[in-house]
Amino acid sequence: LARTLLGKRVVLYRTLAGQAVALEDRCAHRSFPLSRSRLEGDGIVCGYHGFRYDSQGELIETPSQKACPRGVGIRHYPLLERGPLVWIWLGDPRLADPKRLPQRPWLEYPGWACSKGYF
C-alpha cells in the first residue's frame, strides 16, 4: 500500500505474522517504488533489479552480488497499532514516544462500530 504522508513516500504492508511495516517507498539502488514491487516472506523485493529488503529496511540480498554492500538500506518508520488505527512516526525514530499518542479506548468497545479505510 503506497501513501504520501507529510511529503514522504511510504510503503505499508504486513509480515506473515500480521505485523504492520512502514518503509521508505524507494529502492536504495535506483529509487524504484517498492510499492510497485512484490512481497516475499516478511520482506519486499524491488521490481527493478531484485534487491531484497527485510521488514526493518535492511538490504539482505542483491541478485548480482554474493554479498550485500554494508550500510545500504532504506528508512524504516516506527509504527504502532492501537485499536483499528495505525500510528506512524515520520520524524527522528529516537523521539518516537507511544505515550504521547491520543487515547481512544472506545474504538475497541464491543458495541462501537468503526469505518475502516483511508480518509
Functional labels for PLM-detected ranges:
Residues L1-A20, E40-G41, R52-F119:
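Rieske [2Fe-2S] iron-sulfur-binding subdomain
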Residues T15-L16, A28-R30:
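Short, solvent-exposed loop/edge-beta patches enriched in aromatic
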Residues E24:
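A glycine-rich beta-to-alpha transition motif near the start of alpha/beta enzyme domains, typified by
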Residues C27, C46:
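Short cysteine-rich clusters marking metal-coordination/redox-active sites
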Residues R30, G50-R52:
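Detector for the c-type heme attachment site
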Residues S31-R36:
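Conserved HGGG/HGGXW glycine-rich cap/lid loop of the alpha/beta-hydrolase fold
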